[in-house]
């Protein structure tokens, strides 16, 4: 039987032998779509999970297509190294129009699905029109999704119903960008709690199973899907180590918990592959909304949104 490491043992693990970063796999979005479909039956938001599975299918098709990805700017890499910052920081790199082309392709793939509900079809048709006729509006909405805190007045530019589709294209775009990187090109140290590749926050974290990653925790980037090592006894939001707690639903799955911090009053989900072998950072987070409700009732706040379900601050 697998032995669970104690807090002290976790803290003393040899970090030099730990794989720091895992880049997104070639089938990242296909794996996500498959998991969403597995989780849909008997789920309170089953229809939504199936819709997002279709969206992930479209992401995979676009992600797998040949695209002219610009060569890595050596000056950009040098600056990232010098300042300890992610090389493809979503806050300061200029997006090219390719991401809007990818958004258009995702929309067309979804509209080709005859089983799509009419309200979704109407939403996507409107989005397609704006991509063609108002690209500056789409850019403004993307900028707000990437960079505007939930409490900021500019958040009004975010259309919650459109957000998952716009974010889907941004995910594909950034996943392709970081796929051109090598681990050695990243700074040795980058800001805590942010993706070393693109500077985004994690959607959740996962405690791995098997091989050299056994019982090692990795946070999964909400934008580029890269995974990076974070010690298990640390709040992924504020880095506190002393006021952590773990929450589960009474009838929930044992491999899914909410990791909360009394210091900052925030939480993120954490998945344990020894108990939930096929857990996927985005899909299982989305499919466990009752746990989010429990955490809200306990006066904790989500550290950040799942990009497939945008919730505006009230």
PLM regions and their residue ranges:
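Short N-terminal helix-initiation segments at or just after the protein's N-terminus
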Residues: 136-139, 161-169, 201-209, 296-300, ...
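Short N-terminal signal/transit or membrane-insertion segments
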Residues: 2-10, 16-20, 126-139, 196-204
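Charged, low-complexity interaction segments
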Residues: 1-31, 38-79, 263, 267, ...
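N-terminal alpha-helical interaction blocks
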Residues: 17-182
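Residue-identity detector for threonine
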Residues: 6, 12, 16, 28-31, ...
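Cys/His-clustered metal-coordination modules, chiefly Zn-binding fingers
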Residues: 176-294
